Amino acid sequence: MKGIYRWALAAFGSMLLWSVESCLAGAIGGVRTVALSGMPAPGTNETFGDVGYSGVSLNNLGETAFIASPSFNSYEFLFEPRPTRAINDESVWTEAGGSGLRRIAHEGPGLPGDATYANVARPFISDHGDTIYHGSFSGQPAATQRSAVNILRNRLGHTDVVVAAHGSIAPSTSVTYFEIHRPSINANGDVAFFGGVNASVDKYQGIWAEVGGEALDLVARQGDSAPGTTGTFRDLSELLTFDSSLAIGSGGHVAFRGAFFNDRTQGAIWLATPTGALQAIVREGDVAPGTNATFSAVGPPRVNGRGELAYSNDSGRALWRYSTETGLVLIAIQGQQAPGVDAVFASNHINFPTFRDPALGEGGHAAFAASLLKGNVMTESIWHADPSGELKMVARQGAPAPGTDDVFVDFGTSTVNARGQLAFSARTVDFSPLHHGIWAQDRNGVLRPIVKAGDSLNVNDNPATPDLREVQYLSFSEGGSFGSDRITGFNDLGQVAFFARFTDGTSGVFVSNAVAVPEPSSIVALGPLALMYRSRMRRTGH
């Protein structure tokens, strides 16, 4: 019955998106100011200082969540700037639930059970009114605060719920969590994470998930039998990052890369269905489809709501897609003629590995980066693969950057939405953050500039009284491997959320509709429909 509910609710969500598009097709353009330095912080006696610097999460209703502080710090921006503060004064802000911007957590008093924060980390906003955030509690040793993550869920009008806490009993075990690492989260608010428990070294690691409103449960644990093999799970986490190989799709599928051991240690990718069934999708040593070779290593997987996977091998020599209908299918491989281009897909370029960190949208569209080789010249590029596997280049190093008189110099990680629109950050002229920008495709696949360093951005939503500020630096959450919580600033409507710092030292969070179908203000007309969808999700336990 749960599967029927999930299918029906997914269909209803699609109808909601279609209704918004049908009513508002063609209404594009404009930038909405969500929060800005000096703006009153709702529900407090403070004003915003630094806003959104650690990334902005955007849902499919155009709502955002981010970290902000009432204070300012002077520091130099490099590539991914984040202030180091003398005091802990960060807070979590969200627009989830359609109630406007509000603060839901802050460093200091305010956690369930009268606990206090030592620090908070960037939040994720779901499509159904949930904001999920994490951080460490006061009293946890500073040396362990990185691993002593506590995951909490906020819903408008409800008391915050602790999803998992350092020191609590880990489900399906009799031991407590020693460490909880940054979670992977989907658009429905489902959560999956790596954790360590107080147990022997061969039973230390595990993966837990909370799916479809059900209780948190164990997905896999070190030392248990590894399905699809004759061995046991050996390693379930990644050295240092711990979470770059774990993903959860909007259908509740959990995909992860790990290692198993029989007579030797081998890597594999496993997929857990929403019902908890776990299967090995590909193992080192398996024949690699479309080649005469076997997998020597497998890269971290990406998963969508249909349980489809996209992944490369660890050396970035090829890219595959998996679905229950087709099995494993080769998308692209090193040495292959790049379609429509006078070059071949090449081996890894310095700092730009071919087929790195693919993105996979809800509609089955994939996005990936590739190095291209023509003669002795290597260039970077961004590609789109449609659900049938057809490839099309979106951008290339040295090609004109739309909206500028310059060319692309290098690219950030790309992301793709359910329509197949791609968005990415890139630099022009040189590698300076002063020549950084965001580009995205419109509904016709035409690449358009969203915002660039040096632009004059009107931060006042009232066009009658413009307030133009020059962008010095900006950032965009692409949901790549170093943000494997899958926080993204690009939604299925084509809206782009971003952080900008201006030459006057102020900063803000903004949502652009340059390539979107509807204006977010027009979504209000469909508010009752959206609320009914959210209400139905709650009643069915989602």
How should each PLM-predicted stretch be described?
Residues 1-9, 520, 537:
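Bacterial N-terminal signal peptides that target proteins for export
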Residues 7-12, 526-529:
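Sec-dependent N-terminal signal peptides
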Residues 9-22:
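Bacterial N-terminal signal peptides
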Residues 24-516:
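Conserved "turn/edge" positions that cap or connect secondary-structure elements
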Residues 518-536:
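A short, hydrophobic C-terminal helix/tail in secreted or cell-surface proteins
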Residues 538-542:
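Short, charged juxtamembrane terminal tails flanking transmembrane helices
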